[in-house]
From Swiss-Prot:
GTP binds at G15, P16, V17, G18, S19, G20, K21, T22. This is Urease accessory protein UreG. The lineage of its organism: Bacteria, Pseudomonadati, Pseudomonadota, Alphaproteobacteria, Hyphomicrobiales. InterPro entries: CobW/HypB/UreG_nucleotide-bd, P-loop_NTPase, UreG. GO terms for molecular function: GTP binding; GTPase activity; nickel cation binding. Belongs to the SIMIBI class G3E GTPase family. UreG subfamily. One of its GO terms (biological process) is urea catabolic process. Its main location: cytoplasm. Pfam families: cobW (PF02492). Facilitates the functional incorporation of the urease nickel metallocenter. This process requires GTP hydrolysis, probably effectuated by UreG. GO terms for cellular component: cytoplasm.
Length: 204
Protein backbone atom coordinates (compact mmCIF):
# COMPACT_ATOMS: atom_id res chain seq x y z
CA UNK A 1 0.00 0.00 0.00
CA UNK A 2 1.24 3.49 -0.84
CA UNK A 3 1.43 6.32 1.69
CA UNK A 4 -2.11 7.29 2.78
CA UNK A 5 -3.48 10.54 1.39
CA UNK A 6 -6.44 12.68 2.33
CA UNK A 7 -9.66 11.53 0.70
CA UNK A 8 -11.26 8.22 -0.27
CA UNK A 9 -9.26 5.00 -0.48
CA UNK A 10 -8.39 4.30 -4.13
CA UNK A 11 -8.13 0.62 -5.03
CA UNK A 12 -6.61 -0.33 -8.39
CA UNK A 13 -7.69 -3.63 -9.95
CA UNK A 14 -5.47 -4.90 -12.77
CA UNK A 15 -4.86 -8.09 -14.71
CA UNK A 16 -4.88 -9.63 -18.19
CA UNK A 17 -7.93 -9.57 -20.48
CA UNK A 18 -10.58 -12.05 -19.35
CA UNK A 19 -9.05 -12.77 -15.95
CA UNK A 20 -12.11 -11.58 -14.03
CA UNK A 21 -11.43 -7.92 -13.20
CA UNK A 22 -14.98 -6.78 -14.00
CA UNK A 23 -16.44 -9.73 -12.08
CA UNK A 24 -14.32 -8.71 -9.09
CA UNK A 25 -15.44 -5.08 -9.45
CA UNK A 26 -19.07 -6.22 -9.46
CA UNK A 27 -18.57 -8.50 -6.48
CA UNK A 28 -16.78 -5.84 -4.44
CA UNK A 29 -19.38 -3.18 -5.27
CA UNK A 30 -22.20 -5.45 -4.11
CA UNK A 31 -20.30 -6.58 -1.00
CA UNK A 32 -19.28 -3.09 0.12
CA UNK A 33 -22.04 -0.74 -1.07
CA UNK A 34 -24.12 -1.22 2.07
CA UNK A 35 -21.20 -0.38 4.34
CA UNK A 36 -19.32 2.36 2.49
CA UNK A 37 -19.89 5.32 0.18
CA UNK A 38 -18.21 4.14 -3.02
CA UNK A 39 -17.99 4.51 -6.79
CA UNK A 40 -16.34 2.65 -9.67
CA UNK A 41 -14.16 3.74 -12.59
CA UNK A 42 -13.44 1.38 -15.50
CA UNK A 43 -10.91 1.64 -18.33
CA UNK A 44 -11.40 0.37 -21.88
CA UNK A 45 -9.40 1.31 -24.96
CA UNK A 46 -12.22 2.28 -27.35
CA UNK A 47 -15.50 1.63 -25.52
CA UNK A 48 -17.14 1.89 -22.11
CA UNK A 49 -18.19 -1.75 -22.17
CA UNK A 50 -17.04 -2.65 -18.64
CA UNK A 51 -18.90 0.34 -17.20
CA UNK A 52 -22.01 -0.80 -19.09
CA UNK A 53 -21.64 -4.34 -17.74
CA UNK A 54 -21.41 -3.07 -14.16
CA UNK A 55 -24.48 -0.89 -14.69
CA UNK A 56 -26.52 -3.74 -16.20
CA UNK A 57 -25.46 -6.02 -13.33
CA UNK A 58 -26.78 -3.45 -10.84
CA UNK A 59 -23.41 -3.23 -9.09
CA UNK A 60 -24.01 0.45 -8.24
CA UNK A 61 -26.38 3.21 -9.38
CA UNK A 62 -25.45 4.34 -12.88
CA UNK A 63 -24.22 7.76 -11.74
CA UNK A 64 -21.64 6.06 -9.51
CA UNK A 65 -20.02 4.20 -12.42
CA UNK A 66 -17.73 6.04 -14.83
CA UNK A 67 -16.21 4.56 -17.97
CA UNK A 68 -12.90 5.96 -19.23
CA UNK A 69 -11.89 5.46 -22.87
CA UNK A 70 -8.09 5.39 -22.85
CA UNK A 71 -7.73 5.41 -26.64
CA UNK A 72 -4.38 3.64 -26.46
CA UNK A 73 -2.21 1.41 -24.30
CA UNK A 74 -4.18 0.60 -21.13
CA UNK A 75 -0.93 0.40 -19.15
CA UNK A 76 -0.06 4.03 -19.93
CA UNK A 77 -3.42 5.27 -18.60
CA UNK A 78 -2.78 3.79 -15.15
CA UNK A 79 0.97 4.29 -14.90
CA UNK A 80 3.08 6.59 -17.10
CA UNK A 81 0.33 9.12 -17.79
CA UNK A 82 -2.53 8.55 -15.38
CA UNK A 83 -3.99 12.02 -15.95
CA UNK A 84 -7.20 10.76 -17.59
CA UNK A 85 -7.89 8.53 -14.57
CA UNK A 86 -6.83 11.17 -12.06
CA UNK A 87 -9.35 13.49 -13.72
CA UNK A 88 -12.03 10.78 -13.39
CA UNK A 89 -11.20 10.39 -9.69
CA UNK A 90 -11.44 14.16 -9.21
CA UNK A 91 -14.81 14.25 -10.98
CA UNK A 92 -16.22 11.44 -8.84
CA UNK A 93 -15.00 13.19 -5.69
CA UNK A 94 -16.73 16.37 -6.88
CA UNK A 95 -19.99 14.50 -7.48
CA UNK A 96 -19.83 12.56 -4.21
CA UNK A 97 -17.88 14.53 -1.58
CA UNK A 98 -18.36 11.89 1.13
CA UNK A 99 -16.77 8.98 -0.76
CA UNK A 100 -14.97 6.35 1.33
CA UNK A 101 -13.78 4.21 -1.55
CA UNK A 102 -13.08 4.42 -5.30
CA UNK A 103 -12.54 1.18 -7.24
CA UNK A 104 -10.49 1.65 -10.43
CA UNK A 105 -10.37 -1.17 -13.00
CA UNK A 106 -7.57 -1.05 -15.55
CA UNK A 107 -8.01 -2.12 -19.14
CA UNK A 108 -6.80 -5.65 -19.83
CA UNK A 109 -3.02 -5.73 -20.05
CA UNK A 110 0.00 -7.97 -19.65
CA UNK A 111 1.78 -9.13 -16.50
CA UNK A 112 3.94 -5.99 -16.45
CA UNK A 113 1.06 -3.57 -15.81
CA UNK A 114 1.12 -1.67 -12.53
CA UNK A 115 -0.77 1.29 -11.10
CA UNK A 116 0.93 4.61 -10.43
CA UNK A 117 1.07 5.35 -6.68
CA UNK A 118 -0.46 8.71 -7.62
CA UNK A 119 -3.60 6.87 -8.74
CA UNK A 120 -4.01 3.86 -6.42
CA UNK A 121 -3.37 3.44 -2.70
CA UNK A 122 -3.97 -0.31 -2.77
CA UNK A 123 -3.54 -2.67 -5.74
CA UNK A 124 -5.27 -5.97 -6.50
CA UNK A 125 -4.03 -8.08 -9.40
CA UNK A 126 -6.22 -10.76 -10.99
CA UNK A 127 -4.93 -13.79 -12.89
CA UNK A 128 -6.90 -16.89 -13.83
CA UNK A 129 -6.40 -20.61 -13.67
CA UNK A 130 -7.49 -20.98 -17.30
CA UNK A 131 -4.17 -19.39 -18.30
CA UNK A 132 -2.41 -22.48 -16.93
CA UNK A 133 -0.71 -23.33 -13.66
CA UNK A 134 2.52 -21.71 -14.93
CA UNK A 135 1.13 -18.15 -14.69
CA UNK A 136 2.31 -17.37 -11.10
CA UNK A 137 5.91 -18.34 -11.85
CA UNK A 138 6.05 -16.07 -14.89
CA UNK A 139 6.36 -13.20 -12.44
CA UNK A 140 5.93 -9.57 -13.37
CA UNK A 141 5.15 -6.72 -10.97
CA UNK A 142 1.42 -7.47 -10.85
CA UNK A 143 2.11 -10.97 -9.57
CA UNK A 144 5.06 -10.21 -7.32
CA UNK A 145 4.31 -6.73 -5.93
CA UNK A 146 0.53 -6.18 -5.88
CA UNK A 147 -0.94 -5.80 -2.41
CA UNK A 148 -3.21 -8.79 -3.05
CA UNK A 149 -2.98 -11.39 -5.82
CA UNK A 150 -6.35 -12.85 -6.82
CA UNK A 151 -6.14 -16.25 -8.54
CA UNK A 152 -9.53 -16.62 -10.19
CA UNK A 153 -11.55 -19.35 -11.94
CA UNK A 154 -10.50 -22.17 -9.62
CA UNK A 155 -13.57 -24.07 -10.83
CA UNK A 156 -11.87 -24.47 -14.22
CA UNK A 157 -8.75 -26.18 -12.82
CA UNK A 158 -9.89 -29.75 -13.63
CA UNK A 159 -10.89 -28.73 -17.15
CA UNK A 160 -7.54 -27.16 -18.04
CA UNK A 161 -5.35 -29.61 -16.13
CA UNK A 162 -4.10 -27.01 -13.66
CA UNK A 163 -2.88 -28.17 -10.26
CA UNK A 164 -3.95 -25.62 -7.64
CA UNK A 165 -1.37 -26.93 -5.17
CA UNK A 166 1.41 -26.19 -7.68
CA UNK A 167 -0.04 -22.74 -8.34
CA UNK A 168 -0.16 -22.04 -4.61
CA UNK A 169 3.45 -23.14 -4.06
CA UNK A 170 4.64 -21.00 -6.98
CA UNK A 171 2.59 -18.05 -5.74
CA UNK A 172 4.12 -18.28 -2.26
CA UNK A 173 7.61 -18.44 -3.76
CA UNK A 174 7.09 -15.53 -6.16
CA UNK A 175 5.32 -13.26 -3.64
CA UNK A 176 7.61 -13.75 -0.68
CA UNK A 177 4.89 -13.67 1.95
CA UNK A 178 2.57 -11.13 0.32
CA UNK A 179 -1.11 -12.14 0.55
CA UNK A 180 -3.08 -13.96 -2.14
CA UNK A 181 -6.51 -15.53 -2.44
CA UNK A 182 -8.07 -18.21 -4.67
CA UNK A 183 -11.49 -17.29 -6.07
CA UNK A 184 -14.25 -18.47 -8.36
CA UNK A 185 -15.89 -15.10 -8.89
CA UNK A 186 -18.52 -16.48 -11.26
CA UNK A 187 -19.83 -18.48 -8.29
CA UNK A 188 -19.20 -15.70 -5.79
CA UNK A 189 -16.50 -17.71 -4.02
CA UNK A 190 -13.79 -15.58 -2.45
CA UNK A 191 -15.41 -12.16 -2.88
CA UNK A 192 -15.85 -11.68 0.87
CA UNK A 193 -12.18 -12.52 1.47
CA UNK A 194 -11.13 -9.83 -1.02
CA UNK A 195 -13.59 -7.35 0.48
CA UNK A 196 -12.23 -8.06 3.95
CA UNK A 197 -8.68 -7.45 2.69
CA UNK A 198 -9.68 -4.10 1.19
CA UNK A 199 -11.31 -3.03 4.46
CA UNK A 200 -8.44 -4.15 6.68
CA UNK A 201 -5.44 -3.24 4.51
CA UNK A 202 -7.08 -0.01 3.39
CA UNK A 203 -7.99 1.06 6.90
CA UNK A 204 -11.68 1.55 6.15
Amino acid sequence: MTTPHHGPLRVGIGGPVGSGKTALMEGLCKALRGRFDLCAITNDIYTKEDARLLTVAGALPEERIMGVETGGCPHTAIREDASINLAAVAEMRRRFPSLDLILIESGGDNLAATFSPELADLTLYVIDVAGGEKIPRKGGPGITRSDLLVINKTDLAPLVGADLAVMEADTQRMRGGRPYVFTSLRRGDGVEAVARFVIEAGGL
